[in-house]
């Protein structure tokens, strides 16, 4: 029976993996801890969904204000609302990117079947969570604490899994994978933003231009 089986659900007697884990004051078998991490990530994802909806409502409000100001030739107010909307959309992109990146982490955690895969999966995942925590701090301060807990939980599992397998962590490779994952999430978020949100109006055609059209 593999070490992974012994350390996965802790239903069998202690094996080599269990003994090794004991040396490092193992706080519990891996599977329940991975499940806990998954649940915590999903909780944050639900909050991100709620944040996206609120940001979308605010986006619609500001966009309509810009249109009304442009129609009234009130460029000063139009510019004020446009600047606020631009900042709001940066926040929306960050929140959407975070949600997408966390979705990928959950998918990978749910497909882990071997102990060695835990290390390969969690190394970049932990780096992604750290980056997202920093990015969300200025957008959703209330999520920072939860992201810190998730980061700590994943780091603990990563260390314990690495101890059992004797796998040395390649932080450079993990960081590169994390950067790729974040870049992919950012690209998808940008695409979704373009699909869902109209361009910010700068001006409207005058009556002569409309008649010629």
Describe the predicted segments one by one.
Residues 1-50, 119-213:
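Long C-terminal interaction segments enriched in charged/acidic composition
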Residues 77-78:
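Solenoid-repeat scaffolds in large eukaryotic assemblies
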């Amino acid at each position: 029976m593999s070490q992974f089986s012994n350390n996965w659900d802790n239903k069998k007697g202690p094996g080599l993996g269990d003994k090794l884990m004991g040396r490092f004051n193992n706080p519990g078998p891996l599977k329940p801890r991975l499940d806990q991490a998954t649940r915590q990530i999903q909780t944050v994802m639900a909050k991100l969904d709620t944040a996206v909806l609120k940001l979308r409502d605010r986006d619609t409000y500001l966009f309509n204000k810009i249109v009304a100001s442009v129609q009234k030739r009130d460029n000063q107010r139009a510019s004020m609302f446009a600047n606020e909307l631009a900042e709001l959309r940066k926040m929306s992109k960050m929140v959407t990117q975070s949600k997408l990146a966390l979705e990928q982490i959950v998918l990978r955690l749910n497909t882990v079947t071997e102990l060695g895969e835990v290390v390969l999966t969690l190394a970049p995942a932990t780096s992604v969570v750290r980056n997202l925590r920093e990015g969300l701090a200025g957008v959703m301060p209330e999520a920072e604490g939860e992201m810190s807990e998730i980061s700590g939980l994943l780091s603990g599992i990563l260390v314990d899994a690495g101890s059992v397998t004797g796998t040395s962590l390649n932080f450079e490779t993990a960081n590169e994978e994390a950067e790729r994952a974040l870049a992919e999430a950012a690209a998808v978020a940008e695409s979704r933003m373009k699909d869902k949100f109209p361009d910010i109006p700068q001006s409207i055609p005058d009556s002569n231009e409309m008649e010629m059209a």
